[in-house]
């Protein structure tokens, strides 16, 4: 049974501006693919989330997207996060989103705080 790709929105500035659903998703996933692992590590540390963390950014996404999709097809639940905001909007993430859709997967978007309200 295939896992899921979760596009998890992260805080824009204040680490406390994250939704309960986003924290739960990060806690329950098998792997977190992050635009900047150092930046994301601070968020994970703040919420005591201990999951494998891999870099997935504009400079390596072309070489990593197939493996990421294969892992999801094998049953892993993968959370994709950017440094701030929603992946695939103005950040890396479009490529894995498109690849997931082409593979017949149904990515799940975990919305967050809007820049308009921050």
Tell where the protein language model's regions lie, with residue ranges:
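Glycine-rich, highly charged phosphate/nucleotide-binding loops
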Residues: 60-69
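Generic short alpha-helical segment signal, independent of protein family or function
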Residues: 49, 61, 73-77
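Short, glycine/charged-enriched secondary-structure capping and boundary segments
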Residues: 21-23, 46-49, 68-70, 92-97
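Glycine-rich, flexible N-terminal cofactor/catalytic loop recognition
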Residues: 1-59
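Residues that form or flank phosphate/diphosphate-binding pockets in enzymes
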Residues: 17, 63, 91
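Amphipathic alpha-helical transducer elements in NTP-driven molecular machines
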Residues: 37, 62, 113-116
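Short glycine-cluster motifs
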Residues: 73-118
